[in-house]
Amino acid sequence: MKIFLDTAKIDEIKKGVEWGIVDGVTTNPTLVSKAGTPFKETIKQICEIVQGPVSAEVVSSDWQGMVEEARNLAKIDEHVVIKIPMTPDGLKAVKILSTEGIKTNVTLVFSANQSLLAAKAGASYVSPFVGRMDDIANDGMRMVEEIITIYSNYGFETEIIVASIRHPRHVLEAALMGADIATVPFAVLEKMFYHPMTDLGIERFLRDWEKYKAGR
């Protein structure tokens, strides 16, 4: 499974790339606004760091505006993927962009039905929001499981990006189900490194090594 970082912070992206575990980045207007730099400049900087897909979201609500924004964003770098909201106008834009070879990521997906429509419209990626589904007492990962089954049944090439991830368990479940990608906040990615038994093992090895050196 590929791991994307869900952030627009350059320092976090650099760390993830240095660790050798980041395959791409997803952003949204909220994340970019927190980065404190102009939108296009931020996306360009990210593309210079990550040699993989970088999702940049449109802000227009009508299909004409989405298509125009998407064409401009796609000029920034060949790795830019256009995030489009899951709406009728959004899917109309996705269909047009797919015929032009511009990759799209349909976002704000909350059902397998929506994912089916996104795939039929030609989306390159679809982003089901598992954490937000959990927030309203629904099973977000069950939705992902349904999407995987539908895509497998009909051979859709749309890749599934498990989004709105809140904790390492979401990442683990996504991997066990066979999702293509998990887009992970930096804080969650950091938590994935650690286990108390690992820390105890390191401490023991260091103590034993110090005893060995002292006895020589």
Curated annotation (Swiss-Prot):
Coiled coil: none
Listed InterPro entries: Aldolase_TIM, TAL/FSA, Transaldolase_3B, Transaldolase_3B/F6P_aldolase, Transaldolase_AS, TSA/FSA_arc/bac
Predominant subcellular localization, coarse grouping: cytoplasm
Keyword Transferase attached: yes
Keywords per UniProt: Cytoplasm, Pentose shunt, Schiff base, Transferase
This protein's pathway: Carbohydrate degradation; pentose phosphate pathway; D-glyceraldehyde 3-phosphate and beta-D-fructose 6-phosphate from D-ribose 5-phosphate and D-xylulose 5-phosphate (non-oxidative stage): step 2/3
Active site positions: K83
Subcellular localization(s) per the UniProt record: Cytoplasm
Family listed: Belongs to the transaldolase family. Type 3B subfamily.
NCBIfam families, per database record: fsa_talC_mipB (TIGR00875)
PANTHER family: FRUCTOSE-6-PHOSPHATE ALDOLASE 1-RELATED, TRANSALDOLASE
Protein name: Probable transaldolase
Organism: Thermosipho melanesiensis (strain DSM 12029 / CIP 104789 / BI429)
Underlying gene: tal
